[in-house]
């Protein structure tokens, strides 16, 4: 069934240009995590809840938080986990003013501050990473290599389009030209769904 066409001599207004609707993104939800130990578990453990301080967009929270008690007995030992929706936000790395120590990276690459252009959209900031002398774990930002990469080291790679990949260096090295930044740590605690062989788990 179609609408009738206009007579040949009729004046038909040009249709307004249509703007395609933006693709619908999935709601940001995560499956609850079973508490590791019933004896030390507390109410709400493993249940993901929005983080109000981070805010929301498109009616969806930008971050979710849960708490777990990993000790079999002690209830005062807790781990707080925050997950960000990377389809609605992005991860940026800013080099410290002194770390990672490097003799090759330009001082212009290491101001140790969040750039002013990012202040209005900043959701959260955290400080982390090993000092260069503690393992010589690699780091690179915008083409400037502060410390060369180490084989076997867990690498957080930020792609030029803004994606994030976490994997051992040997799985990322082939695509390093596509990365805007990367930072390394000791071996990944979890990779491909499996804990590292040195991690104790019950």
Give the role of each language-model region.
Residues 96-99, 170-174, 202:
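A short, sequence-level motif marking secondary-structure junctions
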Residues 1-147:
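Zymogen propeptides
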């Amino acid at each position: 069934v179609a609408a009738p066409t206009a007579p040949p001599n009729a004046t038909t207004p040009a249709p307004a240009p249509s703007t395609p609707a933006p693709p619908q993104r999935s709601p940001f939800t995560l499956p609850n995590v079973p508490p590791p130990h019933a004896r030390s578990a507390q109410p709400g453990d493993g249940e993901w809840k929005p983080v109000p301080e981070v805010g929301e967009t498109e009616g969806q929270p930008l971050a979710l938080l849960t708490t777990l008690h990993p000790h079999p007995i002690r209830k005062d030992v807790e781990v707080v986990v925050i997950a960000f929706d990377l389809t609605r936000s992005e991860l940026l790395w800013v080099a410290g003013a002194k770390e990672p120590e490097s003799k090759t990276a330009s001082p212009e690459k290491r101001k140790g501050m969040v750039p002013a252009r990012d202040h209005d959209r900043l959701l959260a900031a955290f400080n982390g990473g090993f000092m260069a002398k503690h393992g010589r774990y690699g780091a690179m930002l915008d083409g400037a290599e502060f410390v060369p990469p180490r084989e076997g080291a867990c690498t957080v790679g930020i792609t030029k389009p803004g994606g994030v990949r976490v994997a051992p260096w040997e799985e990322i090295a082939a695509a390093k030209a596509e990365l805007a930044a990367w930072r390394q740590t000791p071996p990944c605690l979890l990779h491909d769904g499996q804990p590292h062989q040195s991690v104790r788990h019950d």
